[in-house]
A protein has these predicted regions:
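Short, flexible helix-loop junctions that flank or precede catalytic/ligand sites
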Residues: 1-202
Length: 202
């Protein structure tokens, strides 16, 4: 998905599921010598070499939406928005993707397919979602289990890739390359974690 020159890619999951860490990892995969990357974050959590990183400050009125408007004037190739929280930011993110930018962000919903519903609930027109959304990743963090004790954590992923903007919403499941259930089953079978831990994390 990162090879596509424009479109919207969203990472979702509950609070504390590692969404931002995944977002940072994906951004570091970009060739920043050839790609102009601007990040809007609240707060800036880690340095991304070669990127322009801007901290959001809602207390003084510098919101994601206002930051995104100013960023678009600088003509970036890729835009990272720390989180899509409201209708204004969602609409600006979608319209940025529509005008030839690669946009990556996080959004608060539980499943990759649920991203579509969440955007519509925020008031984004379905035709705009269809024209821009190229994929979504849902994730959970689970504790590793060695058979006797828990130590460290690992991620379970769900991966939705939308090949074209002609895909119908009722066909989205056909484009779910990996489900959270598949990922959990694999982690348990490889003795990475326990079935109890999977159930605990939902």
């Amino acid at each position: 998905l990162l090879k596509r020159p424009y479109g919207l890619l969203l990472i979702c999951g509950p609070t504390g599921s590692g969404k931002t860490a995944t977002l940072y990892a994906m951004l570091r995969m970009l060739n920043l010598e050839e790609t102009k990357l601007i990040c809007l974050e609240d707060p800036v959590e880690a340095e991304i070499k070669g990127a322009i990183q801007i901290g959001i400050n809602e207390k003084i009125g510098f919101t994601f939406a206002k930051g995104l408007r100013s960023v678009l004037r600088q003509d970036p190739d890729t835009i990272m928005i720390g989180e899509i929280r409201d209708k204004e930011t969602a609409e600006l993110a979608v319209k940025s993707a529509l005008t030839g930018h690669r946009v990556l962000s996080t959004i608060h919903t539980n499943t990759a397919i649920g991203v579509v519903t969440r955007l519509m609930d925020m008031g984004v027109e379905p035709y705009l979602i269809r024209a821009t959304l190229m994929g979504a990743i849902a994730q959970r963090l689970v504790r590793k289990f060695d058979g006797t004790t828990y130590h460290g954590r690992t991620a379970l992923f769900e991966y939705l890739e939308i090949p074209t903007n002609s895909v119908h919403w009722d066909q989205l499941e056909a484009h779910l390359l990996v489900s959270l259930e598949d990922s959990a089953r694999e982690a348990v079978s490889q003795h990475v974690t326990s079935i109890e831990e999977v159930h605990r994390c939902g």
